[in-house]
Amino acid sequence: MNYDLLDTLFQAYFDVRKGKRNTVNQLRYELNMEHELLELYDDIVSRRYNPSRSICFLLTELEIKREIFGANFRDRIVHRLIHDQIAPLFERTFIADSYSCRKGMGTLYAIRRLDHHIRSCSRNYSRPCWVLKLDVQGYFFSIDRKILYAMLRSYLERHWTAYCAAQPAGRYMLDSELLFYLLERVIFHDATQNCIVRGSRKVWADFPPSKSLFHAAPDCGLPIGNLTSQLFSNIYMDRFDQWM
């Protein structure tokens, strides 16, 4: 048994548990925590891991409705494991003005950066400058999963030494074969298959297909709601960010 990997899974569990102590799925998982984590460990090392059913619902509290897929608690642990393994490397490559779901780079930080750039470009408001505002329609649902996986695998293979160096001191590193296996299982999992859809028909009636994973092209789209989806989307967009 690889006790370092098992310990890393336990740590991922404790990280996922933060802020979810009172949820039904977390409480159910915690009742059999040791057994559940050992079973997850066995599934991972024996290459039998498959993501479970997600719960799909519409987030209606915001001005714009969002389709959210809530992963099974077990799968959230795997998402955390993957995220913590690769995020330190890719965070170093992102441009300074990429703000989506990045620690310490929230809305206030973005506003301050925008103010800095406007003042710099306009020479402290003494000459005109322009701001380009655009949006990639249905971005999450247009991400090609085959391209995403190829990008991740190619970059990690070419920068494996940097990947190892980027890890915080004391953190266990997955070997490349296991990391690529987990990336493949998560990226190519179709969250729409056998998912549990919640919400009345009235709530869903006027939801635009362009904003739904159910209407994405084959092998395209990432579920909004997964921790890994946020990181993957930043990695996928990074080439465009660098070009801009």
Predicted stretch roles:
Residues 7-10, 34, 38, 71, ...:
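Non-catalytic, well-ordered alpha-helical scaffold segments
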Residues 19-27, 52-77, 93-105, 190, ...:
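Short, conserved non-catalytic motifs in the polymerase core
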Residues 4-10, 51-58:
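Short beta-edge/loop segments at beta->alpha junctions of small alpha/beta modules
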Residues 43, 80, 84-93, 117-121, ...:
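Mid-sequence acidic-hydrophobic segments that form the walls
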Residues 83-144:
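Active-site-proximal segment of RNA-dependent polymerases
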Residues 30-53:
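Amphipathic alpha-helical blocks
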Residues 123-244:
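Conserved polymerase palm-domain catalytic core
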Residues 1-38:
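Non-catalytic, polymerase-adjacent accessory regions of viral genome-replication enzymes
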